[in-house]
């Protein structure tokens, strides 16, 4: 999963090639090289987004502010950018002759059928959802994924063992320097780390599985300098005081998973950077009046998820 379909696919919007267009018909949202993206496509992605975010954060999430806009505006914008991205990726795939093989087409057909059959008649008629159009949508996302795999498989991205290393630590944390010095003295007297952590840590938590980039750099440097069984001296980071003990300086299984995740992120970033140039050169017609009518917070939640259904397709 490169995160192409997933909500975590963050893409910057260069926006330079998007032209507001009228007279595109009420079911059409976008056009690139004569190929259409339908209102249905947006409704399908909005259903996923609404159910996912409301399950995690309840419906109060939509009015929260993020980067100067509401979370709803932010998510809606991400969906717009994603639809345009998939549309343009299909244009590039066409130029490169990337098509689906027979097994992939079968997978798409089954996915579209499954999705269509989970909808009520009323849901189908509202955005003119047909099995053919769903088949096209699954096909286009699959082709985009295939193009992505194709373009990123040749990338030579190095990740050092140390960058991906996941370590297990225990820590003692206090708000004042006096307190941490007391704790340090008690450790030196031979008290167990666990007992002292329980005594000083206000929330009772004292263990953490650490990856690079998660904590303040001073904390990270001190933690990553330790070998298994070693303890740090007093570390000051972001206004708090810590003593860190390393229980494992390399959780091998977690490190492997982390390395894959870092690699996927770097590939996505490299792909986006390269692809944005191509996309900026494309003439994208966008149906703003149709888009204005759609809302994520009041999207119909279908009894089926596009992302889950899409993930049943094996893409070579």
Which residues does each predicted region cover?
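Surface-exposed patches in mature extracellular/periplasmic domains of secreted proteins
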Residues: 96-104, 195-197, 233-235
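Single conserved hydrophobic/aromatic residue that forms the stacking wall/gate
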Residues: 1-6, 10-11
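PPIase-associated folding chaperone regions across multiple families
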Residues: 7-8, 15-25, 32, 123-175, ...
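Short amphipathic beta-strand/extended segments with alternating polar/hydrophobic composition
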Residues: 37-41, 185, 244
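N-terminal targeting/tethering segments
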Residues: 21-129
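Peptidyl-prolyl cis-trans isomerase
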Residues: 182-220, 252-254
